[in-house]
């Protein structure tokens, strides 16, 4: 051995004067490899989709691909999120509370305080970063919404872009929403134009499915045994609710019953399925109309449901069509995800893929009382009129609109709960759809679990399913402990105790807490979309499983 040869401490070969007597060692430079037979992982994150929307959760929107996953897995009837998109996605990917990782609110509302700075620390690594160090290929497709605004440009450091947070490939949009016909696309680390136009049959949901399949297939051609993690986040059902007319027309007449009747029909379906207990009662559609703010402000008109019986025929026609368009948007996107499932099945990967399906929060009330042909009006405190929307009635869902249904449908799609997205104090904001499937690893198929689960519990459970301890270091950085708790035991045994005892909620001035049996806590309502002032509500909220006594929480 030659002294001072520059040999690294990890090198276990031999360096001699004669190369014929030397032995190389490639170990220190080898790429990480996954354990034998490690499963693939697919996270499917829907947007703004309430628990009473899909047919497999009792709703009236047909979702055959989601039902296909549910039939091969477990539905969670007591799954909860953060009430808003960026925080939920941060909690999902890190296995920690959103406030732990600086994401107390969406990127657009972040402030220079530790829990709300919009920058996920590197000592709270994403699942993608951990799996990349364990031999997985990692792909992010669709909505991201975890990059600070000042980094969302080509001159930035891109430290919080997907490709800097453990994802090898990215195709999607950095912000919270985008046009589904003409999206703002980023491919890996640079902006690109859509590959086609709506006139050519382009829609973002199809494009995202194509890219998901492409990314997986490209790697499998080279390394067929290498597992992958795909984080797939379609724009559906966030506004704009864009879809081809023929898909909206599939629901012609489906919602003519109105949103109050929809709630009654769906509640009975939920009871029959076991999504809610048989003695569950509906909450009122306008539970806080009599509540005033500290200076006597009335409950905001933007957050008020117009009773269906108070509408004239033209208004009913418009409101029903807006729901048809939304339903068509979801079903079309479901069909594109079905293509991903078909590819996985045809390539022999489906049974050994852990699939996690969630919605990031409850249905959105951002359409205001009348719905809108331009969602941006809501964020500027402007309530769209029926007269304005009727001018574009035949264009709803097309490139000429940026549409959103009326708030009454948000209450309907969150049946049986109160309120909607943004409200961490009420189940309408935080009680959401969730499905977990892994045919080769989870014996339960087509079953429902009512164990209390929070979004931060998902990734700890996936680590548990993999037989993998949460990493102590990632990229050489010591990691903080996870906040979430694995519920793997409950997937096998519905009576299992997951060990979870407490979960807190906070969003834009609203708050709630679940503790063992669901202890209530005072609630405050969030700021109006056009301002940052909050208006207190009366009463209290509980995040427990609904019963006849507490279904209105």
Where are these regions (language model features)?
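Formylglycine-dependent sulfatase
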Residues: 1-540, 544, 548-553
């Amino acid at each position: 051995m030659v002294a001072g040869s520059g040999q690294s401490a990890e090198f276990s070969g031999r360096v001699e004067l004669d190369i014929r007597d030397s032995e190389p060692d490639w170990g220190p430079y080898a790429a990480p490899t996954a354990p034998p037979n490690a499963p693939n992982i697919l996270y499917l994150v829907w947007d703004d989709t309430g628990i009473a929307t899909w047919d497999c959760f009792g709703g009236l929107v047909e979702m055959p691909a989601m039902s296909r996953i549910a039939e091969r897995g477990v539905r969670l009837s007591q799954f909860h999120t953060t009430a808003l998109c960026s925080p939920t996605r941060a909690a999902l990917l890190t296995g920690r509370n959103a406030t732990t990782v600086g994401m107390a609110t969406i990127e657009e509302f972040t402030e220079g305080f530790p829990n709300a700075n919009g920058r996920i620390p590197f000592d709270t690594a994403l699942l993608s970063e951990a799996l990349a160090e364990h031999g997985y290929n990692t792909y992010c497709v669709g909505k991201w919404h975890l990059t600070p605004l000042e980094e969302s440009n080509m001159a930035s450091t891109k430290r919080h872009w997907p490709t800097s947070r453990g994802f090898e490939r990215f195709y999607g949009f950095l912000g919270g929403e985008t046009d589904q016909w003409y999206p703002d696309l980023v491919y890996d680390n640079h902006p690109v134009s859509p590959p086609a136009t709506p006139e050519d049959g382009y829609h973002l949901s199809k494009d995202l499915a194509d890219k998901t399949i492409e990314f997986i297939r490209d790697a499998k051609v080279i390394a067929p045994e290498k597992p992958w993690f795909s984080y797939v986040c379609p724009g559906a059902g966030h506004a704009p609710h864009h879809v081809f007319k023929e898909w909206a027309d599939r629901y012609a007449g489906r919602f003519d019953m109105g949103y109050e009747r929809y709630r009654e029909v769906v509640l009975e379906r939920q009871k029959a399925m076991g999504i809610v207990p048989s003695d569950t009662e509906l909450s009122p559609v306008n539970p806080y109309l009599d509540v005033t703010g500290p200076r006597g402000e009335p409950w905001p008109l933007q957050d008020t449901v117009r009773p269906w019986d108070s509408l004239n025929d033209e208004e009913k026609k418009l409101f029903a069509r807006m729901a048809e368009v939304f339903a068509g948007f979801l079903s079309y996107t479901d069909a594109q995800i079905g293509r991903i499932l078909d590819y996985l099945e045809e390539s022999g990967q489906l049974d050994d893929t852990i699939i996690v399906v969630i919605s990031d929060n409850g249905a959105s009330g951002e359409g205001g009382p009348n719905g809108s042909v331009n969602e941006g009006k809501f964020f500027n405190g402007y309530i769209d009129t029926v007269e304005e929307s009727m001018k574009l009635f035949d264009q709803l869902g097309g490139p000429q609109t940026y549409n959103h249904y009326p708030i009454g449908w948000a209450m309907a799609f969150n049946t049986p709960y109160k309120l909607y997205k943004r409200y961490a104090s009420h189940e309408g904001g935080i009680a959401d759809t969730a499905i977990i499937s892994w045919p080769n690893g989870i014996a339960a198929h087509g079953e429902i679990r009512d164990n209390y689960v929070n979004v931060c519990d998902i990734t700890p459970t996936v680590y548990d399913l993999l037989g993998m301890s949460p990493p102590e270091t990632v990229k050489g950085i010591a990691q903080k402990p996870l906040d979430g708790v694995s519920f793997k035991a409950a997937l096998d045994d519905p009576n299992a105790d997951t060990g979870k005892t407490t979960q807190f909620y906070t969003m834009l001035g609203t708050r709630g807490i679940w503790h063992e049996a669901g202890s209530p806590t005072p609630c405050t309502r969030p700021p109006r979309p056009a301002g940052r002032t909050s208006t207190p509500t009366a009463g209290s909220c509980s995040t427990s499983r609904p019963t006849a006594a507490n279904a209105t929480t």
